[in-house]
């Protein structure tokens, strides 16, 4: 029926070392193509605890069992333990995924630092953070990255412009309903934004009686009779670990519905850029997620 683009955000050292290879094995069993987006610098997961005073944050973490999914040690990075350098400590794990034939791209340099700061930062700060991740990616993989997917769907105008400056043809930095060309400062950029179109597991778990036993069926309702291509974002720390059985149910369900699995690059190759609409960079809220993020206007 349609393509399901599988986009994996890798936020942490543990996710890179444990969740990523677990997902690779799952994808092999399903003959599924996918795109891995890596965090390439320090793991400061513990800094996220400062979000406790943000509206909706406590409600979200109470639904998704943060300690169970991330582990106590992981939550101490940047608080009681120094943040390990993911790109140094897990270089072999990242290279193995690339060598296995999966598409790889940039998620961020420092996940929590980017997510909590980028919206209000200037062009110089943004360029420094993005160039660190770009240089590290080349160090690890020996070639420039082809795509980008922002941490927490958080960006600013300069970040979108940097994607153009890198020569990337496509990225997935927000939420929405279909591919489009982003407009910044009245100027239409060159790269295509392919937003996440489906809800993530952690956004629906714990809502209206949805749990690990029925969440796959809930997500599958969005694609049961929908002929349009979709972008699904998953996390190495969730679907690659405790939620792996649920994710396998999703993959089996999508295959039974007649869908195929694709990388971001596969999806981009099917698009006619000249026919795509343009939309200004916009912020908004998504059910099940605290705070504002990049959204595609309706």
Where on the chain are the PLM-derived regions?
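Positively charged, amphipathic and often flexible ligand-engagement surfaces
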Residues: 193-207
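Catalytic alpha-helical scaffold of carbohydrate-active enzymes acting on polysaccharides/glycoconjugates
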Residues: 1-147, 152-192, 210-232, 239-298
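Short, glycine-/Ser/Thr-/acidic-enriched flexible segments
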Residues: 199, 237-239
